UniProtKB/Swiss-Prot annotation:
The lineage of its organism: Bacteria, Pseudomonadati, Pseudomonadota, Betaproteobacteria, Burkholderiales. NCBIfam families: PRK13548.1. Signal peptide: none annotated. This is Hemin import ATP-binding protein HmuV. Part of the ABC transporter complex HmuTUV involved in hemin import. Responsible for energy coupling to the transport system. The gene is hmuV. ATP binds at G35, A36, N37, G38, A39, G40, K41, S42. It is a peripheral membrane protein. One of its GO terms (molecular function) is ATP hydrolysis activity.
Length: 262
């Protein structure tokens, strides 16, 4: 069962944000969404998540139009990590991660506690479990929020049902080690757990290393879509980012690319 955007057009205040964009997120794949600032990446992710209604076009989860699903139904099928999660309450880290179980009231407290423990471990933040969320650094908060959506993903597991995870710039506050760990986890969720994962990143080389498919947006339109070798070309770097770049075979990772801006 795929999550598919078909010919999406979306505007805000009369200004076009997306124009005729089609994209498929399939089970078992990690799709990277790239583009310059203001290209429409977060808007496309929000539309795929069912959080924004397009002016025209549709988003389908299998045969179901996302517009026919309510918030609870959506939350039981896909998890979303926004670019800037808003949390104004002084909660403990475990409580924040436990919010991932909110769409599943049928879970008993013991099951929720196990979900939280598993998500904390998978996100590498078990050592933060007893801390207060507002006291954490920006990078620590980002990793805790990642644990929250991991808990949600684990809670939604049901035989025969594909789960989807959407991450909007999840590594923006992370150091290089934790960037790689988070993206490695995202790829494992796709390849090993069969999830469909969409991630917005600005680091082209991280996208080239971890993603199976890349979608490159430019001014609200899809400029390129396909495997990294087809998307990360000098011509695309010039047209989308306005930079001259060399695209080389990665010296230590077979089959991967390295993009070097001149």
């Amino acid at each position: 069962m795929t999550l598919q955007a078909r010919n999406l057009t979306l505007a805000r205040g009369g200004a076009p944000i997306l124009t005729d964009v089609s994209l498929t997120l399939a089970p078992g794949t990690l799709v990277g969404l790239l583009g310059a600032n203001g290209a429409g990446k977060s808007t496309l992710l929000a539309a795929l998540a069912g959080e924004l209604a397009p002016r025209s076009g549709q988003v389908f989860l299998g045969d179901a139009d996302l517009a026919t699903l309510n918030a609870r139904q959506l939350a039981r099928r896909r998890a979303v990590l926004p670019q800037k999660p808003s949390l104004s309450f002084d909660l403990g880290v475990s409580d924040v991660v436990g919010m991932g179980a909110y769409p599943f009231p049928e879970l008993d407290p013991a099951a929720v506690r196990q979900l939280v423990r598993d998500a904390l471990e998978q996100a590498g933040v078990t050592h933060l479990a007893q801390r207060r969320y507002p006291q954490l650094s920006g990078g620590e908060q980002q990793r805790v929020q990642f644990a929250r959506v991991l808990a949600q993903c684990h809670a939604m597991h049901a035989p025969g049902q594909t789960r989807y995870l959407m991450l909007d710039e999840p590594i923006s506050n992370l150091d290089p080690r934790h960037q790689m760990e988070l993206l490695a986890t995202a790829r494992a969720l796709a390849h090993e757990a069969g999830m469909g994962v969409l991630v917005i990143v600005h680091d082209i080389n991280q996208a080239a290393r971890w993603c199976d498919t890349l979608a490159l947006l430019a001014d609200g339109r899809l400029a390129a879509l396909g495997p990294p070798a087809d998307v990360l070309t000098p011509d695309h770097m010039r047209r989308v980012y306005g930079i001259e770049a060399d695209v080389l075979a990665h010296p230590t990772l077979p089959g991967r690319l390295l993009v070097l801006a001149r």
